[in-house]
A protein has these predicted regions:
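Short, non-helical or kinked segments that cap or interrupt transmembrane helices
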Residues: 32-43, 100-113, 140-149
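Interfacial segments of multi-pass membrane proteins
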Residues: 47-52, 73-76, 94, 108-138, ...
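C-terminal ends of transmembrane helices
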Residues: 22, 27, 92-104, 130-139, ...
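Helix-coil boundary and interhelical linker segments in multi-pass alpha-helical membrane proteins
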Residues: 1-11, 68-86, 117-124, 158-173
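N-terminal signal-anchor transmembrane alpha helix
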Residues: 2-28
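Loop-to-transmembrane alpha-helix initiation sites
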Residues: 125-127, 141-150, 166-178
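Cytosolic, membrane-interface loops and tails of multi-pass inner-membrane proteins
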Residues: 23-55, 104-106, 187, 191-204
Length: 204
């Protein structure tokens, strides 16, 4: 593995992740999403501020960022699986702490899930289904994000141990880093969940 390729992939992935899709969509509608609700740029806050259509576009854009970063590292820069995993994690970090928004951003749920699918669909697709079910039943976007990130790390570990032929240990790096990023970004939400004051998503 050529480390200069990995470093370049990580740097580009961070910039890709930093593209503030929700913020740009909000601006297109005359709204500064940073001044609404949670102040985050993710789909949940866009949904609350602007409705379903803009939120759906935000979710799609955020998902594509992580997938594009991994595809760039894996198929164009040929970094190998570790480089792809690090690039995916860098995209999530860029999404959560965008250099273009003075290091503000989202919580990384959709980007993390999309990156998980891009790295290992055997893990990613079931985890997205589970996270979606958790969201549907609880209406807590934060819990769904934690399910996709921390649950994804747990699932990657189980798959690696049980079915090593369809897993790569390098993907655990992605799972670990993205879990840290999501948990850190969701600290206020976790506190509200523990206090029973977290807002549910009710607008569609």
């Amino acid at each position: 593995m050529e480390w200069h390729r990995v470093v370049f992939a990580v740097a580009i992935a961070y910039l890709i992740g930093s593209i503030p899709v929700g913020y740009l969509i909000g601006r297109a509608h005359g709204v500064n999403i940073l001044q609404h609700g949670s102040g985050r740029t993710g789909g949940t806050n866009v949904l609350r501020a602007l409705g379903f259509g803009p939120a759906a576009l935000t979710v799609l854009g955020d998902a594509l960022k992580a997938a594009a970063a991994i595809a760039l590292a894996r198929h164009i820069l040929l970094t190998g699986e570790l480089g792809a995993a690090l690039a995916g994690a860098a995209a999530i970090i860029g999404h959560n702490w965008s250099v273009f928004l003075k290091f503000r951003g989202g919580a990384g749920g959709m980007s993390t899930a999309a990156g998980l699918i891009a790295l290992n669909a055997y893990v990613g697709v079931p985890m997205v289904v589970i996270a979606a079910l958790v969201f549907y039943l609880s209406r807590y976007a934060s819990v769904a994000t934690l399910t996709a990130s921390v649950g994804g790390l747990a699932a990657l570990t189980v798959i690696l141990l049980a079915f090593p032929a369809v897993a790569h240990w390098e993907h655990l790096v992605y799972g670990f880093l993205t879990s840290l990023a999501c948990v850190w970004a969701l600290r206020p939400n976790i506190q509200r969940l523990l206090a029973g004051t977290e807002r549910r998503v009710t607008r569609w």
